[in-house]
Amino acid sequence: MFLDYNPTQGKVAGDHAYKTQQPLPPLNRWVQSYWQLTVPKGLFHYHSVPDNCVDWIINLDCFDDNFFIPPFLSSTVFHIDGPASFFGIRFRILGHQGLISVPLGEWGEVGSVKAEDLLPADIVYSVYEVIYNAKSFDKRCNSLSAVILSAVTFADVDPRLARYIRYCYENVSSNLDLSDSQSSKFGLSARQLRRLTKQHVGLLPKDFGKVLRFQSVLRAMSALQSNKVYLDHYYDQSHFVREFKRLSGVTPTQFKKMSVLYNHYSSK
């Protein structure tokens, strides 16, 4: 399934510290974006927020340090000893299934898993060759697109799960109804829905919906000058601030001002 869903991770201070590129069709059905983070010398923190996506993160200075990160529900802070550079492949919702046959529910609880434990050795080696030989971000993106496109397959997505995900996406501004009555419209019970989403999305149904709404607000905050973007998504401002802080670890005002990459000894 394809959703035009483009999450954000917040801004990084510095002109060239963080780069992103979206792949062209047809690969964009599976991969949402490529990204590259360049960290200067020093002890740094990278403040990552939930986005419902699976990321493949590769240390450009040490390919053995490459791993998959599953979706998560609260902010995750990565501690980085710079200088260092990381390249990432952010998959669309369920897009990782085009490469990974192991259900997310069987490895997502670990927190991170080495790519070699989830992918065939030839795919990992082909990606290694690209990372080793391509010396620029654009070349890496273009070469990796060819590698991934040759390896990716159309995974069988349970139509009931697809209906649920599309329902969440199309009703992101409303209070999601995940009762047995609503779940029956997807073709299953609320209990079956919980089991299905946990197995394939990595989160419980309500949590998945909360992250979609959170990401919708983040994009609105980036695009608008108004401080009342919450009006389209939450009951009131206190509800908005409370849930925003629960997911991001900071208040909306703090997030708008901060660089998500910051020095260990400095404030955000």
PLM regions and their residue ranges:
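Alpha-helical DNA-contacting segments of helix-turn-helix folds
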Residues: 157-159, 168, 197-221, 243-260
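Conserved active-site tyrosine of GNAT-family acetyltransferases
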Residues: 31, 240, 244
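Alpha-helical bundle regulatory/interaction domains
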Residues: 1-180, 186-190, 204, 225-235, ...
